[in-house]
Design a protein with these regions (language model features):
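Short beta-strand segments
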Residues: 50-84, 100-101
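Anion-coordinating catalytic cores for phosphoryl-, nucleotidyl-, and glycosidic chemistry
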Residues: 3, 35-36, 44, 87-90, ...
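A generic structural signal for nonpolar/aromatic side chains embedded in well-ordered alpha-helices
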Residues: 46-47, 91-92, 155, 183
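Broad gene-expression machinery/nucleic-acid interaction feature
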Residues: 52, 66-68, 97, 117, ...
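Short solvent-exposed loop/turn micro-motifs enriched in small/polar/acidic residues
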Residues: 48-50, 63-64, 112-113, 176
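Helix-adjacent hinge/juxtasegments
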Residues: 87-117
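Short, basic/aromatic recognition patches
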Residues: 26-54
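Charged, gly/pro-rich active-site loop segments
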Residues: 2-34, 107-204
């Protein structure tokens, strides 16, 4: 499959996700304290800015398994990388439902017995990006391997930008020993402390 066709298919898939977004959101619990809810744009901005969060999965014996992990956000998707095997990988293969939490602010206010917080939680479906059947020639990439390579480049540029040569060498040496993971966001909520809401309103 040509790269252009792959991108067209991806755009069509994204359009389907967007059209179903309202239906998906209706299946999730709504925030009780609406006044503290962040706008969608503010929640996305937090995901774009942060460098790590906590990924929650259904682990062994159906116990919740929450693991801190670095990530990159792109077009309503989260991307992660992983070793080829482990608790996280087994959990993802067993159940594709997941959530992801990022805490942007957590300022303890001792005298008020509270914290000034701002955080985001995403709910969605998580998948291992399979690269079987593709070619691993970086000059002739097809199949799932292309998406895996794209994820590796996004992660590398996110944490060490403007070092293309070093990133290329790292990818060539380590790509075969890593898994790429995609989290398709179905529902996104952000919340902040009421004190932050009031402070912003007073400044307006």
């Amino acid at each position: 499959m040509e790269f252009r066709e792959m991108m067209e298919q991806r755009e069509q898939s994204q359009a389907c996700l967007d059209s179903a977004e309202s239906r998906q959101d209706s299946t999730f619990r709504q925030m009780r304290r609406k006044r503290q809810q962040l706008a969608e744009e503010a929640s996305i901005a937090i995901l774009e800015k942060a460098t790590a969060g906590t990924l929650a999965l259904l682990g062994d014996n159906d116990y919740p398994y929450a693991v801190p992990i670095s990530y990159v956000y792109h077009e309503r998707k989260l991307y992660f990388h992983s070793a080829l095997a482990g608790h996280k990988v087994d959990a993802i293969r067993k159940c594709d439902k997941a959530s992801f939490c990022v805490i942007e602010q957590d300022d303890v206010q001792p005298e008020k017995y509270t914290t000034f917080f701002r955080s985001v939680i995403a709910f969605g479906r998580i998948h291992i990006i399979e690269d079987e059947g593709g070619t691993h020639d970086v000059d002739n990439i097809v199949g799932g391997y292309h998406e895996k390579l794209e994820v590796a480049r996004m992660l590398g540029n996110r944490y060490n930008p403007n070092h293309d040569e070093a990133l290329q060498k790292e990818i060539e040496n380590g790509l075969s020993r890593m898994l790429a993971i995609r989290f398709d966001i179905e529902h996104l909520t952000g919340k902040e402390a009421i004190e932050l809401v009031r402070g912003r309103q007073n400044n307006d």
